[in-house]
């Protein structure tokens, strides 16, 4: 995953992370396209014993992923994603489960023909500063490899 990364330097910041008080916005490029322009995907994810992969399981932890389609291309879509829960590989595993693995995500069945890594980017992170109580938003532009995919023909061309 490329983009913004947040580290906790103290217990208060760590509590914000674990309590899901930090809002992350992701950009992903998925295989195919959703029928609806936006939606909420819910499932239960469980880690494999070595935590290399997550999979949907009835005894997994609840997982909520919201998406909004930004652009549709021939064979894939650019989507905006936010997560209400923070599970290991949540976006990757959820998109694959719903039939739309990330481009470049070999672990979850995505094609590596157009990009060699999972096409997932943390576009922004928003949180309340622990001392000033002001909302801080940090953002990061899409990396070159994902920008190149945006230059391919759109589905309506």
Placement of each model-derived feature along the sequence:
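RNA pseudouridine synthases
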Residues: 1-157
């Amino acid at each position: 995953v490329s983009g913004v990364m947040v580290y906790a330097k103290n217990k208060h910041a760590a509590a914000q992370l674990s309590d899901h008080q930090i809002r992350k916005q992701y950009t992903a490029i998925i295989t195919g396209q959703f029928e609806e322009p936006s939606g909420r995907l819910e499932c239960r994810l469980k880690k494999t014993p070595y935590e290399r992969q997550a999979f949907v399981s009835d005894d997994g932890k609840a997982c909520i992923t919201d998406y909004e389609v930004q652009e549709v291309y021939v064979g894939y879509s650019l989507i905006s994603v936010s997560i209400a829960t923070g599970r290991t590989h949540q976006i990757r595993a959820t998109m694959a489960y719903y039939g739309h693995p990330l481009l470049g995500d070999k672990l979850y069945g995505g094609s590596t023909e157009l990009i060699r890594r999972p096409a997932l980017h943390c576009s922004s992170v928003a949180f309340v500063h622990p001392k000033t109580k002001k909302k801080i938003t940090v953002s990061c532009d899409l990396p070159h490899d994902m920008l190149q995919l945006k230059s391919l023909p759109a589905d309506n061309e």
